[in-house]
Each structure stands twice: as C-alpha cells, then as structure tokens.
C-alpha cells in the first residue's frame, strides 16, 4: 500500500478538483430545479447537455488519476479480484432483458432493506475480519453518502414507476415475477412527470458520482470494495433504463446519444463498464491484501458479502452475453432486434451458446483462451478493461463458433461480423443435428474481403474496425449452427486468399429476421 500513501498530495488535489466541479454542478442543478422553464424540452436539453459534459469530465479526471496510482496491482496475485468480477457479472447476468431493471435492483436494495443498517453490517463484518476499526470520520462519511444515495434512488424509482404505470410498462423483480402496478390514486400527466424525472436523473447522477468517488478513495478502497460493487450495479441499471426509455421520457437526444461536447449515456455506459471491471481488479486485490495482512487465514475464509445479498434464491438458467458485452447488450435493449419478452441466451458449460426462440441479435465476442485456443466462453483476466483480442497469428487452427438451436426452432437470420481483417477471410456455415456432413445438413460457404470502417460498439477503444454483414437470408431448423473461419497457412503470397498476421475477429453476430 506504500505506493498509494506516496500519492496523498495528488489525491487531495484531485478531490479538490472534484469539489470545485461538484459545486458548479450543484449550482446549475439548483438553477435548473427553480427555473420556471423546466417544462421546456429545449431548455432541458441544453442544461442536460452541459451537466453531462461536466460530469463526464469529472469521471475522466478520476479515472486518469486512478491509472497513476494503480501500479501496485502488478505485484499482487493476478486473479484475486475475480470474486468481485464474478459477483458483478452474476448480478447483471440475472437482469431481465425487458422492462426497467433499476426497479428490480432497488427492490432488492432499497425496499425491504434498511440501507443504513445494511451499510453498518458490511462495515462491522470488515472490521471484525481485519480486527481493526476504520476511522469514524470516514465511516460516517461513507454512511452519509450511501444513505443519501438510497434516498435519491428511492425517489427516482417512485417517479419512474409512476411513468411506467401510466404508459403500461411492466416491471419484473429479480425472480422474473411481475411487480404489481402502483396503487396510487393520483397518476400525474407526462407534462408533470417528465420534468421531475429529468431533475431526478441529474440529482441521482451526482449522488452516484459522489458514492463511486468515495468508494474508490485510494486510502480505504481495499476496505469498502463491496460498497463499490453494489453502487456500480445500481448505476449501470440506472443508466440502462434512461437509455432505453429516455426518448419516450422526452430526454434530449444529446443526453442519450451524445453531441460534439457531450459523451451521451451510450458512451458513458460503455466506458463505465470497462473502467469498473478494471477498478474491481484493483479494489479486490487491495481488499484481499488488507484482510490477509491483518488476520489469520486466506481469501477463501472471507467471501465478499455480495453473494449473501445479491444472488437470487433460485438460480436463473437464462443469462445475458458475457460481462464485457454488457454495454452492447444495453445498446440493443431499445432496438427492434431485442426480444420483447421471454428468455435470452443460455451459456452451456461446454461453451456452446443456446439461442432463444425469440427474435434477438446474438452477439458473441471472441476470446483468446489462456490455454492457447480460441473460444466464445473463456474469461482470461487480461481481457477485462477493454483490451482487444490477441491477433490471429499463423499457424493456428480454424476459429469455430457453435450455437445450439433449442428444440430445432426454425429460424431465419443474417450474419454480422466485427473484425479487423488483413487480406480476406473465408467462412463456412453449416447446420446439422448430430454430426457434420450428415445427410440433410445445410452447408454454405461465403467470403468477405471489404469492410466499412466504423467505431466498434463492443471494443470501442481499439480504434476503427470493419463491420461486414452477410445478408443471407439463412434458414434452418437444425439443432446446431456452426460458423468456421477457415485459416489457410501455406497460400502463395501473390494470391489474396486467407487472412494474414494482424487480423482480429472481435465478434460474430446472428441476427434473427
């Protein structure tokens, strides 16, 4: 922890910067809340645009400083933070693909749980394990921040629930059961509700930023990592719902999609997921280092309390794509390709993706396994934080992607591949019931050689990539759908055949038509 102590002055300067930014945002927020023009959508948009730019800059300042003080992680055990990542993934795996997820999250956290008591239980458990009391000032500060966050979440949940009820949008709890609609006798009009939701959005974003900044404070980050986990999950769910329903709630387009000066919720959500996964690695290692240095025993003797609070009583069998695709999942949540209800995708233990019978975009990110092969369900620790896949270098085998079509559901689909291809890539599609080449199997070869250069929504930090669509349409009722990227090693250099060193396959998507 010595490297963190040496940065005390930098941390203090950083917190002062945050304080100044915070006071400016608070001032703008008060002016906005007291303005007689809050019903004006254009006025809302201008203010929200300014607010999001300042808040995003605040997050960027913090993340840059965290990069400077996180070099101690290289000296610690590489996989020690996996329990925090697993907890974060488990929570988000069980989010329903439809309906407002913030309602579900806060129904677990807020309603029925005293947030102050919940916080005290976490701190007490930490202090018992490390046999040391945390400073009262810091404990009280965290308690106040967490309690204020809970109140703001409760207010936002109530306001948005009224809007959902008025617009006939059903909410589900963490077990997939429908939450009864509000019994309130007074349902405000959209003209009344939407400005209140806009103001609540601004207030809650500030509260989330305060909490996340506090829980990643370098001095105590290793002690309060569970609070960072809970807060981050609520924040992701909060942003996801505004992204999904924001247009209908009359949010300005710049808030959702960004503008020249504002990142927008899409980018904020994508960046936050990447930063958070990296942050959990740091927090988890420091947390473990603190516990193991001050008590007898090992990490396994102190499983994070996240498992006692968040995991649903019944294990969900249908889950979303891998955690590093969460941002992409949420982007699709408001598109025509996302299912209107029912199951999503089930990941079998052998790495096969079982496709839902509902219409959906099945996006499979490609991972490089630490075992030396390519697959779609490997989670090497270095993959988190937005790093791109290792280039496909010769000589390697063909890249194979197998998906299970449950109950031989007849489906028609097209294929989209996100990639960086040097030369060309030849693909083979075959659909079968038992063995490749069996009687009645459907085979089709196709080649793509050109790309449209755009920013990739999954791994946006790698620069530009190609997105190639093979329109098909492809139709099958077979049990297995398999895509094979054929790698030719010994082709003549003069022929433009086969992909060369420097190529990357980032994702393979089956899009039901």
Swiss-Prot record:
Q: Which Gene3D superfamilies match?
A: Pesticidal crystal protein, N-terminal domain (1.20.190.10)
Reported induction: Stimulation by changing levels of cAMP via the cell surface cAMP receptor.
Q: Which residues form a coiled coil?
A: none
- GO molecular-function terms, A-Z: toxin activity
Q: Report the InterPro entries cross-referenced here.
A: Pest_crys_N_sf (IPR036716)
Q: Its domain of life?
A: Eukaryota
Is this entry keyworded Cell division? Answer: no
List UniProt keywords, sorted A-Z.
Answer: cAMP
The UniProt similarity line reads: To D.discoideum protein M3L.
| Protein name in the entry | cAMP-regulated M3R protein
Q: Which organism is it from?
A: Dictyostelium discoideum (Social amoeba)
Q: Which gene encodes it?
A: prtB
